[in-house]
């Protein structure tokens, strides 16, 4: 049921975008400079004629479905009194670095610092290797109780974590419970120090 609802929401969003594209495609011209240069992010829904209210509602609905509804993929837990959270792979009922990093990306974009911090804490506590040749990297696959199912790392997860942490540093600064910039730098250092044999 959970998988069905998630797929239904995603398909609905694609249908909505897909049905609007043919009639409005002429209005959408490529930008000469990207957001990194201009500081402006392109809003395709706005360009397609949707009102700010409609766009905000669609985003809020999607966030609610994934993070707060009865069929959510995000779960909050406490481990030794520390608030943590994880994003469950809906099909396999497990946790992967990909899902964790995607959850953090959504949280930083939606300005949900507590959710972001919970996911990062869970990832560091359960997924990050504390010793051995993969020290500092993350097991890509865990059970929802935190037990690692695969010790190897998947570099996409680490790179997405770095991106999320850099965005969090920019949005929230580094003076709170988590120094996002330092975490990103530490992870980058761990990534660059590996020779590929671990």
What spans do the regions from the language model cover?
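Hydrophobic core
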Residues: 15-19
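Aromatic- and histidine-enriched alpha-helix N-cap/loop-to-helix transition segments
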Residues: 91-102, 111, 152-163
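Bacterial N-terminal signal peptides that target proteins for export
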Residues: 1-10
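Low-complexity, Ser/Thr/Pro/Gly-enriched N-terminal "stalk/linker" regions
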Residues: 22-98, 109-143
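Extended ligand-binding groove/face enriched in aromatic
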Residues: 69, 125-198
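Active-site cradle of extracellular carbohydrate-active enzymes
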Residues: 107, 120, 195-198
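Solenoid-repeat scaffolds in large eukaryotic assemblies
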Residues: 103, 115-116, 177, 184
């Amino acid at each position: 049921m959970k998988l069905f609802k998630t797929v239904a929401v995603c398909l609905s969003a694609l249908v909505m975008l897909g049905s609007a594209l043919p009639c409005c495609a002429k209005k959408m011209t490529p930008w000469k400079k990207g957001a990194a240069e201009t500081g402006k992010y392109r809003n395709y829904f706005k360009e397609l004629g949707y009102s700010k209210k409609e766009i905000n509602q669609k985003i809020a609905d999607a966030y609610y479905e994934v993070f707060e509804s009865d069929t959510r993929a995000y779960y909050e837990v406490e481990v030794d009194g520390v608030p943590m959270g994880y994003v469950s792979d809906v099909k396999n009922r497990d946790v992967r670095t990909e899902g964790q990093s995607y959850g953090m990306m959504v949280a930083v974009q939606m300005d949900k610092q507590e959710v972001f911090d919970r996911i990062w804490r869970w990832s560091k506590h359960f997924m990050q290797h504390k010793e051995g040749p993969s020290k500092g990297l993350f097991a890509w696959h865990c059970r929802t109780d935190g037990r690692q199912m695969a010790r190897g790392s998947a570099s996409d997860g680490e790179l997405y974590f770095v991106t999320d942490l850099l965005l969090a540093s920019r949005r929230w600064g580094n003076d709170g419970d988590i120094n996002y910039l330092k975490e990103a730098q530490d992870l980058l250092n761990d990534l660059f120090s590996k020779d590929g044999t671990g």
